Design a protein with these regions (language model features):
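Cyclophilin-like peptidyl-prolyl cis-trans isomerases
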Residues: 2-7, 18-232
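Cytosolic-facing loops and C-terminal tails of multi-pass membrane proteins
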Residues: 10
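Hydrophobic membrane-targeting alpha-helices
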Residues: 13-17
Length: 232
């Protein structure tokens, strides 16, 4: 009887030993491969479903005149779109021909958002005369993407005059609202930077302060717009 009990005890001890999990490798190495016929651990999980990557938003090619903005930090070339924004482009060209933009400044630098010019000189004083506003052309199929140029305006839709801004990022929230049946929302894109985006980014990163028409967004050192020229 004692032999049977002893044999049973030895059998239970052996079973318990095999039931204990193997300790992890002392050197922190990789776990051992699964036993023959057993799948790898991650094979028991469903494979991830490939996700379609949305293409980056783009604007259609723009057709129209070009402008050269000569600033104290370098030159910026704009391609305007007189097909999709004819009234806006004609309005801006009028100011260019009248030399309205000469000796003004990029007076607003909203980091990661926009840089803006058109109505103030380097001292932050109002510059020039605005003959009248231009009708809003935001519903023209052009989006406020990085490097695009759009008209600044007041709350009223048809209130843009001389001021415009360059987008430092994709600011699609500034676009015409899809559920707006008329041209009453958004900011009208009328051009695109084709050269000098490095200058735009440099302007967008200058130190700013409160000494200007846009407190907290006024360049500490004025960014002078020496001249805006219509290119042939």
């Amino acid at each position: 009887m004692r032999q049977i009990v002893l044999a049973l005890a030895l059998c239970l001890a052996a079973t318990a030993a095999f039931a204990q999990p193997a300790p992890p490798p002392a050197d922190g190495g990789a776990a051992q491969a699964p036993a023959a016929g057993q799948p790898p651990a991650d094979a028991t999980q469903p494979a991830p479903t490939p996700q379609a990557v949305a293409p980056a938003p783009t604007n259609p090619p723009m057709t129209g005149p070009r402008l050269l903005i000569s600033t104290s930090m370098g030159d910026i070339t704009l391609q305007l779109d007189s097909v999709r924004a004819p009234k806006t482009v004609a309005n801006v060209l009028r100011y260019v021909k009248e030399k309205h933009y000469d000796n003004t400044a990029f007076y607003r630098v909203a980091k990661g958002f926009v840089i803006q010019m058109g109505s103030f000189d380097a001292k932050g004083k109002p510059h020039g005369i605005h003959p009248g506003p231009v009708p809003l052309e935001a519903d023209n199929g052009l989006s406020n993407l990085r490097g695009t140029v759009a008209m600044a305006r007041a709350d009223a839709p048809d209130s843009a005059t001389a001021e415009f801004f360059i987008n430092l990022d994709d600011n699609v929230r500034l676009n015409h609202a899809a559920d707006d049946p008329g041209n009453t929302t958004g900011y009208a894109v009328f051009g695109q930077v084709t050269s000098g985006m490095d200058v735009v980014d440099a302007i967008g990163n200058v130190p700013v302060g409160d000494n200007g028409p846009m407190p907290g967004q006024a360049p500490v050192t004025p960014i002078v717009v020496k001249k805006v020229t219509l290119l042939k």
